[in-house]
């Protein structure tokens, strides 16, 4: 019989509790929260499953499980999220990085293989900085600018740049509503963005952990099509000839965005599907 304070027993009890609260992936969340608390890899929980937690550890774990039972995302409880081979600090001022955005980073790096030299790159609506910082890690010779309308989001991005890249000076940070505060003389070879694109009318269909905790400024729009059209038009003016815009978008808007953009002077455009088969990405060339 397992001791009531052992790792294995506490995991089982936590899983049962979270399931009763209708939390998806209850077991996984229970493991992540405990492994992070004990500073262990998840697999090490089972190597040490007979280990007993002390009173302080038990209380801290109980508090974490209670937070998760109220739909608080695991990433906000642990203050971190893995993204493209790095661990990013996150809080409720930034969107939690998604696997689809990792795919966006991968597409950029795949398209820009080889020694193409120095590139000026803008990560627009940067949030945690996960896109721009991941690109900088892979391509040291790229000049990266991170911009966001939210001062609090830029503070998170700055913290991540320091922790992951070693020195803040590797990247430029700009607080800006789209391109409004970005110097007009600044021209970019590449703009990458995961902007807000979910219609506010779809809000009720979202999971409670998203609605209750993630920043609505980074998610929802009254009119995504108009917002994205404005973004695309402004991006055109800031790209060099032959420059590219990579966007994560609402799949239902992909065809419209491509046709409208070509009609307004973009050289070409293409749609890329994510791993689930949705038309998630638009790539435009000036």
UniProtKB/Swiss-Prot annotation:
SUPFAM superfamilies: S-adenosyl-L-methionine-dependent methyltransferases. Its EC number is 2.1.1.297. The keyword Methyltransferase applies. It is an enzyme of class 2 (transferase). It catalyses: L-glutaminyl-[peptide chain release factor] + S-adenosyl-L-methionine = N(5)-methyl-L-glutaminyl-[peptide chain release factor] + S-adenosyl-L-homocysteine + H(+). The lineage of its organism: Bacteria, Pseudomonadati, Spirochaetota, Spirochaetia, Leptospirales. Methylates the class 1 translation termination release factors RF1/PrfA and RF2/PrfB on the glutamine residue of the universally conserved GGQ motif. Transmembrane segments: none annotated. This is Release factor glutamine methyltransferase. S-adenosyl-L-methionine binds at residues 148, 194. It comes from Leptospira interrogans serogroup Icterohaemorrhagiae serovar Lai (strain 56601). GO terms for biological process: methylation; translational termination. One of its GO terms (molecular function) is protein-(glutamine-N5) methyltransferase activity. InterPro entries: DNA_methylase_N6_adenine_CS, HemK-like, N5-glutamine_MTase, PrmC_N, RF_methyltr_PrmC, SAM-dependent_MTases_sf, Small_mtfrase_dom. Substrate binds at residues 194-197. Keywords: Methyltransferase, S-adenosyl-L-methionine, Transferase. The keyword Transferase applies. It holds the Pfam family PrmC_N. Disulfide bonds: none annotated. Belongs to the protein N5-glutamine methyltransferase family. PrmC subfamily.
């Amino acid at each position: 019989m397992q001791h009531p304070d052992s790792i294995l027993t506490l995991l089982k009890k936590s899983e049962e509790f979270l399931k009763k609260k209708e939390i998806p992936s209850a077991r996984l969340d229970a493991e992540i929260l405990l492994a992070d608390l004990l500073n262990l890899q998840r697999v090490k929980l089972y190597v040490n499953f007979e280990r007993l937690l002390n009173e302080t550890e038990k209380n801290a774990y109980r508090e974490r499980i209670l937070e998760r039972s109220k739909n608080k995302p695991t990433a906000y409880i642990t203050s971190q999220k893995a993204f493209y081979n790095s661990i990013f600090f996150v809080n409720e001022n930034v969107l939690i990085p998604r696997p689809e955005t990792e795919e966006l980073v991968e597409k950029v790096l795949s398209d820009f293989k080889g020694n193409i030299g120095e590139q000026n790159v803008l990560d627009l609506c940067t949030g945690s900085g996960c896109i721009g910082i991941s690109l900088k890690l892979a391509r040291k010779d790229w000049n990266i600018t991170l911009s966001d309308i939210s001062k609090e989001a830029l503070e998170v991005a700055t913290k991540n740049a320091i922790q992951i890249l070693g020195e803040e000076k590797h990247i430029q940070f700009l607080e800006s509503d789209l391109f409004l505060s970005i110097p007009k003389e600044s021209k970019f070879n590449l703009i990458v963005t995961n902007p807000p694109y979910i219609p506010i009318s779809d809000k009720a269909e979202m999971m409670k952990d998203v609605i209750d905790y993630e920043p609505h400024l980074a998610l929802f729009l009254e009119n995504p099509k108009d917002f994205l059209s404005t973004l695309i038009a402004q991006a055109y003016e800031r790209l060099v000839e032959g420059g590219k815009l990579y966007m994560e978008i609402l799949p239902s808007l992909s065809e419209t965005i491509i046709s409208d953009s070509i009609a307004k002077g973009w050289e070409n455009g293409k749609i890329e599907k994510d791993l689930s088969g949705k038309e998630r990405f638009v790539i435009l060339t000036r």
